[in-house]
Regions:
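Signature of the SF2 helicase/ATPase Hel1-core->accessory helical subdomain module
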Residues: 252-337
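Hydrophobic anchor at the beta1->P-loop junction of P-loop NTPases
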Residues: 155
Length: 545
């Protein structure tokens, strides 16, 4: 049987064959004594596998709903296939609706699954490669802690392989291991139960652990999730500057989106430029321009775990490719690199991610064959108005359908809210009005997001406008970067501190990366509109019209 146990603020979900004994255990646990409302789900057709599946689904949905704080530990949610699972899942939908009618849930399933609380929740069923990586990471980390050896760990994966989920999941798991009062309810069915055994808690309980997220918007979203998750707190989610400024070192730093850490470059404000200098002086005794935010992370922690996709560098200030390659080489030499392969976001699978990266590669496309992706809506539009209308219909039906674009138009509406930024084919559009959590903001369906508001996030459908910053030369048969039509000032800024001038080929690689990120946001589909006629004609051979 499966049960929920809740009070006014908290909820716990469990599975047991002996409910009475299980309730006695809960009543004896101080952290659950305030839970006084019990609901038991009984079905004579439910076997052990079905009960574990229902338990894990309820945990995930309750975490995403946000009405209650979920008290379950993150010791490995089950997601195993079993006989007749599809039919049992239909019964789960009925159970959910009954629980919602009883006010256990506030929102419908579709709304929950579109929320950041759900998408960024640590309560996730891991893919096999994520689970293998997690187990290997934990085994190695605990060995390092036992022997008092510093360590560097690296997780690599393409867009949609769940790097951010691994970062969040691991942070929660380490905190749970460190704070678990007693292993009274750990089960052999739990994926990571062995790490809650005696000895591991003692290695972690006094350690300072934090999650580092370079992007402002994603960092704010994760902070909201951490604030509502027992064992975690918003102040555990830091910017690289907060790490550098800390007067106390960290024991473990988990760094998401490592490719967005900065080298020494002109920052967004004079205040941040001054901070860069101050941090270098504090940590290294000099303001050598070769120091990067990667160096800050290493200097400020004994153990580091980096999550990386080098093809998602999008600005000149991001760590250079050679620095990232050096990190990969040194970590691989120690046997501490873990790849993620399974595509969790895009229904087109890993082949789709590879395909869109190749058709927009700065290298001439000479060996690419047309591919279709059954079950995934991938379409090229000749008219932006038509694409916008289709996207609105998808948003009305499924939610989370958004327009995104390269930074090929100036942000006029930032100073004058009545001005339009993008005017094409009868469409009059403005850039995103908020830089934080734009995807879920009111009116987002009427706006256009940039790389800085969507990198790291999932959409159901993405309508991608490839602007005039990217063109195609049919004579040379290659992509061309149009500097005059690229309006991200920081995206094309030279680096006089390091004596670097970025030519058009350098920026073409970054702009190609940007569109590669935008084209891999949509879980169910991606619609494409291309401004440059030659590039549009070129892409017709690769994208269905």
């Amino acid at each position: 049987m499966v049960y929920t146990l809740n009070g006014s603020r908290d909820v716990y979900v469990g599975e047991s064959v002996n409910l009475a004994a299980r309730m006695r255990q809960h009543l004896a646990a101080p952290e659950k004594q305030h839970l006084d409302d019990v609901r038991v789900i009984l079905d004579e057709t439910f076997n052990k596998s079905v009960c574990l599946d229902l338990e894990s689904q309820l945990i995930r949905l309750l975490a995403g709903d946000g009405k209650y704080r979920v008290l379950n530990r993150n010791d490995g949610i089950t997601d195993s296939d079993y006989f007749d699972r599809a039919n049992y899942r239909d019964k789960f939908d009925e159970i959910f609706e009954e629980l919602r009618a009883a006010n256990v849930f506030e929102r419908p399933v579709a709304e929950i699954m579109n929320s950041d609380l759900f998408k960024l929740s640590p309560f996730k069923a891991l893919t096999p490669d994520q689970a293998i990586a997690m187990e290997d990471i934990l085994e190695g980390l605990f060995l390092d802690l036992e022997t008092d050896q510093p360590s560097t760990i690296l997780v690599q994966g393409d867009p949609g392989t769940g790097k951010t989920i691994v970062a969040i999941y691991l942070t929660k798991l380490l905190r749970d291991i460190a704070t678990i009062p007693a292993p009274e309810d750990l089960s052999g069915d739990s994926m990571f139960a062995e790490f809650f055994a005696e000895g591991h808690r003692e290695l972690l309980e006094d350690l300072r652990i934090a999650l580092v997220v370079p992007q402002q918007s994603l960092r704010a979203s994760i902070r909201q999730v951490f604030a509502r998750t027992p064992g975690l707190s918003a102040d555990m989610v830091l910017s690289p500057f907060q790490v550098g400024e800390s007067t106390d070192p960290f024991d473990i730093l988990i760094v998401d989106e490592t490719h967005r850490l900065n080298q020494r470059a002109n920052q967004a404000s004079g205040v941040l430029n001054a901070k860069f200098t101050e941090i270098n002086l504090q940590l290294f005794g000099s303001d050598d321009t070769s120091w990067t935010q990667l160096d800050w992370i290493i200097a400020q922690s004994r153990h580091q775990l980096f999550l990386l996709d080098s093809a998602q560098r999008v600005r000149p200030a991001d760590l250079p490719t050679e620095t990232l390659n050096g990190l990969v080489r040194s970590t691989k030499a120690k046997g501490r690199v873990y790849p993620l392969w399974s595509q969790m976001r895009v229904r087109g699978g890993a082949d789709y991610v590879d395909y869109v990266r190749r058709i927009l590669s700065p290298e001439p496309a000479v060996d690419i064959s047309y591919q279709e992706f059954p079950g995934y809506e991938f379409r090229l539009y000749d008219n932006l108005l038509d694409m916008c209308q289709q996207l609105r219909e998808k948003d009305a039906a499924d939610g989370l359908a958004r327009l995104v674009a390269g930074f090929a138009w100036p942000w006029r509406s930032k100073k004058n809210s009545k001005e339009y930024d993008i005017e094409l084919d009868g469409c009059h559009l403005q850039w995103n009005r908020t830089a934080v959590d734009w995807i879920n903001s009111r009116g987002a369906i009427d706006e256009v997001g940039s790389i800085h508001t969507v990198q790291g996030y999932d959409l159901n459908y993405a309508g991608v406008i490839i602007g005039p910053d990217l063109r195609y030369d049919p004579l040379q048969r290659k992509l061309i970067f149009d500097r005059a039509n690229y309006h991200d000032t920081k995206g094309k800024e030279n680096n006089p501190r390091l004596g670097i001038k970025y030519d058009d080929d350098d920026l073409l690689r970054l702009v190609s990366n940007i569109y590669g990120v935008l084209l891999t946001r949509g879980a169910r589909g991606t619609f494409v509109y291309v401004c440059d006629p030659d590039l549009r004609n070129h892409l017709r051979q690769f994208i269905p019209v």
